[in-house]
């Protein structure tokens, strides 16, 4: 992630072979990833191997996952990835979040500019604490991103919308014995994005506006038990994600274009 200087998952996937990230709307600016040429709905995005990203949160999901929460990204291309989900025909993208390994602290910051017209700011922080006997540990992360709207041709309508996002989360573990482990993770995202024109006015006072505000809470709990010199394993897990979205998709000063959506996704197994 440091080599490609990316701030979110969407920018990172551009450098993966067999993948292509496209920006499909100049107003709301939602990205989608193509695997083997197939459109976004044919791909499955997992977090720590759990399919908790719903169709609602997946619309803008590629930009809502900051790089400082990611340890690595596993990509499976082709029809065989359909074993991970019904819509994983093109492939699967599995996001593995950072695990606490040692005591560490890191702060990063980045400023960028597009054609001298639009500034983008990113700040991130990571903290990891691990017990001396490795019986417990916790990794915390926080990121902030702010992007001004970008109007390339000067017609008053954005090519890239305004974006403001805060993300916080942690991943922790506890080992009751040498052969068992309890994992707990949680992250929350508060994001505002808007595209169109006349950004100083309310959405219903403009010619066209697409605006969303997301509050996403996601978490998971798992228990692993090993025996026979770690050759055998039993695992129980549960993950959940709740998405609260307030939106405006309208034109010509339409007062009826406001909307509110709530979505709950959960998965459990062993």
Which residue ranges define each predicted feature?
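Membrane-spanning beta-strand positions in outer-membrane beta-barrel proteins
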Residues: 44, 104-106, 135-139, 179-185, ...
């Amino acid at each position: 992630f440091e080599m490609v200087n990316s701030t979110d998952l969407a920018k990172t996937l551009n450098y993966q072979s067999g993948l292509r990230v496209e920006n499909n709307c100049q107003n709301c600016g939602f990205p989608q990833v193509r695997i083997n040429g197939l459109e976004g709905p044919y791909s499955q995005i997992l977090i720590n191997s759990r399919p908790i990203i719903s169709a609602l949160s997946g619309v803008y999901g590629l930009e809502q996952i900051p790089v400082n929460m990611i340890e690595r990204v596993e990509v499976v291309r082709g029809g065989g990835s359909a074993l991970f989900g019904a819509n994983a025909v093109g492939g699967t993208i599995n996001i593995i979040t950072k695990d606490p390994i040692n005591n560490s602290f890191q702060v990063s910051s980045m400023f960028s500019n597009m054609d001298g017209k639009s500034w983008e700011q990113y700040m991130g922080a990571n903290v990891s604490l691990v017990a001396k006997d490795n019986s417990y540990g916790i990794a915390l992360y926080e990121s902030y991103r702010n992007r001004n709207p970008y109007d390339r041709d000067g017609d008053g309508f954005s090519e890239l919308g305004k974006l403001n996002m805060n993300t916080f989360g942690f991943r922790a573990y506890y080992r009751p014995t040498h052969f068992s482990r309890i994992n707990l993770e949680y992250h929350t995202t508060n994001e505002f994005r808007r595209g169109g024109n006349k950004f100083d006015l309310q959405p219903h006072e403009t010619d066209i506006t697409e605006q969303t505000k997301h509050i996403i809470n996601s978490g998971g709990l798992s228990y692993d038990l090993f025996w026979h010199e770690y050759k055998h394993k039993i695992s129980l897990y549960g993950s959940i994600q709740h998405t609260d979205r307030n939106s405006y998709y309208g034109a010509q000063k339409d007062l009826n274009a406001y909307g509110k959506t709530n979505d709950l996704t959960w998965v459990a197994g062993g």
